[in-house]
């Protein structure tokens, strides 16, 4: 039984190993969350939605899977590709899930208690957040740092904590539980994620891909888990994971932000498809053919113009039809029986 996953010279075995520190950490996170949520609800301060609880539990499960046997043990001392998989899971899966599950009052109270409110205001600045994440990523994947930290349980624990902290900072401008820390512009959020996650990572991932020799002594000297898979091949696969592993989640987030932006700004209505319907004339006659056009009802069509049946109320200028009489003292126009000129139908 060990406290945390670390490099080992023992041959790899698929016999499960218990890492008590990992288990206690996950239990402590969940216990803290549910106790604080229960006390807040009992005191009437705020309630935690069921969806938020599910997100936190899912995030902790991903965190546990990335830290415990077998992935945690493989990443700590046997496979560079497993090490990189841990990094991706910490950065773009577990951490954002947990952040999305934290109620704003809970997170704000935690920062205030730890006296970190002012610090997080600075860390949430997009440029600062991007620098913190990318500097941490490059520093922890530098060969001397990786070999040093992975050699002991304490060092491996420190590396995992650094990844989680950097991931929290990365996501602050986009999904911070405290809304005042988020960026105000959806296009800004999309551009930030693209630049913060997709640019700097090219350098270390390219180094892993093009190197003809193993650059990590930890994984070069480790007993082979897959006998036909060399340390260089494992390292190259790690480079692929580092470059592309976060791409689906980051681009899915950008797409979600884009959809929300279009919905809230009205762009989806402006560029969306036109409503279709049948022309309804002032005399009540209905055209048999469906046509494309603006969604006007007979009660809302411009004076003397045909209307489209089945449209939404309020989409057009009010006319003075029998269904929408003129105000008192104003003469109501009679519907014209003359055919409409072509320019009035356009």
What are these regions (language model features)?
Residues 1-346:
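Alpha-helical membrane segments of multi-pass proteins
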